[in-house]
């Protein structure tokens, strides 16, 4: 049986160090029963590898969790025999994985973009015959992300760091961030009611480190780590899964997040830099 003191959350805000035993206790923007988390996963296993503890922590605080898996898993085969069936296999493994962490099956969503081909789906365009992930006669990552953001209406979004080597991770990061503003604006009304405000966004690490240090540390009981490892083990088709589990175990029952800040351009911010100043004389 876990105790409250088995959980530790530390958030760094400037020179302030906030410590608590819940996510809510270290958050300035917590929206009580309106909280809703959306994890955007370039590939089916990215969220469990980078945020398998956080998914469980959300459940602990009664926050609904939705997982949007961007690609179809078609490039994940490790044998010739699997080439034609790997998407189906990965889909079954994915449901097993995230349902084991308490995510309802209906909250596990597949966008359906072809694995390793996301560069061809940047932006939004009128769908043509062989396009994938068609919504309202349009295709493209920004079309899909805007649609799902408006349908799910999350208060917070989580996505792998932009510093990852995998092009799919980088593309998803970039396309999601601009889609947050699309989803909060009035364009493309056929994709749903605009969001009242832009959700807060956090990066989590999967394979590569953060570009800038994280600001939130989450520490859980060992049982949460064992649940995470068991969920990762659902991806039996992936031959390298044992090495990934070793890495996760060595990291212990801890995960970290980096908050993404949108620093919008404001000319007045630079005005003082260019103002004429009195000459300054220095004495030795």
What are these regions (language model features)?
Residues 52-54, 80, 111, 121, ...:
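Hydrophobic alpha-helical membrane-insertion segments
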Residues 48-52, 91, 173:
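Short amphipathic alpha-helical segment that frequently serves as the phosphate-/nucleotide-binding helix
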Residues 45, 71, 94, 108, ...:
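Divalent metal-coordination and catalytic microenvironments
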């Amino acid at each position: 049986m876990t105790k409250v003191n088995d959980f530790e959350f530390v958030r760094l805000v400037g020179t302030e160090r906030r410590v608590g035993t819940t996510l809510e206790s270290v958050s300035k923007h917590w929206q009580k029963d309106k909280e809703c988390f959306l994890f955007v996963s370039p590939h089916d296993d990215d969220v469990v590898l980078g945020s398998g503890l956080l998914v469980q922590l959300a459940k602990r605080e009664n926050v609904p969790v939705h997982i949007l898996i961007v690609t179809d898993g078609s490039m994940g085969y490790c044998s010739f025999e699997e080439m034609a069936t790997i998407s189906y296999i990965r889909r079954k493994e994915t449901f097993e994985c995230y349902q084991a962490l308490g995510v309802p099956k209906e909250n596990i969503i597949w966008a359906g973009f072809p694995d390793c081909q996301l560069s061809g789906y940047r932006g939004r365009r009128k769908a043509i015959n062989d396009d994938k992930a068609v919504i309202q006669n349009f295709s493209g990552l920004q079309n899909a992300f805007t649609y799902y953001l408006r349908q799910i209406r999350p208060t917070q979004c989580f996505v792998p760091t932009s510093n990852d080597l995998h092009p799919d991770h980088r593309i998803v990061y970039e396309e999601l961030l601009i889609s947050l503003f699309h989803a909060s604006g009035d364009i493309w009304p056929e994709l749903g009611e605009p969001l009242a405000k832009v959700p807060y966004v956090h990066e989590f690490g999967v394979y590569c480190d953060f570009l800038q240090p994280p600001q939130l540390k989450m520490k859980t009981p060992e049982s949460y780590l064992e649940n995470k490892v068991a969920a990762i083990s659902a991806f039996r088709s992936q031959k390298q899964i044992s090495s990934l589990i070793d890495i996760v175990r060595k990291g212990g029952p801890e995960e970290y997040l980096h908050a993404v800040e949108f620093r919008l351009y404001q000319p007045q911010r630079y005005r003082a830099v260019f103002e004429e100043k009195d000459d300054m004389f220095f004495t030795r």
